[in-house]
From Swiss-Prot:
Keywords assigned: Ribonucleoprotein, Ribosomal protein
Self-association and partners: Part of the 30S ribosomal subunit.
Xref: PROSITE patterns: RIBOSOMAL_S10
Record-given protein name: Small ribosomal subunit protein uS10
Gene name of the encoded protein: rpsJ
MF terms (GO), sorted A to Z: structural constituent of ribosome; tRNA binding
Organism whose genome encodes this protein: Chelativorans sp. (strain BNC1)
Keyword Ribonucleoprotein: yes
Annotated GO CC locations: ribonucleoprotein complex; ribosome
Length: 102
């Protein structure tokens, strides 16, 4: 696969699971002879939700919840066919969303 790069974008709510999956992908790619750029940490998306604590009164009493989405970016430069096969067979954690672009 001459001159072609694989860009992998990972998303997860838990950064520990995300980092473990990233390490697993990097070690698999390096083991098969590909060059890896990254992991590059992308900005964390924070969604905040504000709700009333009570159902009817006390508008001043509110509670805030937040949801953090952590992201990482990996570039695999000049992947070998063995690299592609190993990445296809790789089993990652359930809470990690993987987007792959060629």
């Amino acid at each position: 696969m001459n001159g072609q790069n694989i860009r992998i974008r990972l998303k997860a709510f838990d950064h520990r699971v995300l980092d473990a999956s990233t390490r697993e992908i990097v070690s698999t790619a390096k083991r098969t002879g590909a060059n890896v750029r990254g992991p590059i940490p992308l900005p964390t998306r924070i969604e905040k939700f504000t709700v009333n604590r009570s159902t009817h009164i006390d508008k001043k009493s509110r509670e805030q919840f937040e949801m953090r989405t952590h992201k990482r970016l990996l570039d695999i430069v000049d992947p070998t066919p063995q690299t592609v096969d190993a990445l296809m067979k790789l089993d990652l954690a359930a809470g990690v969303d993987v987007e792959i672009k060629l």
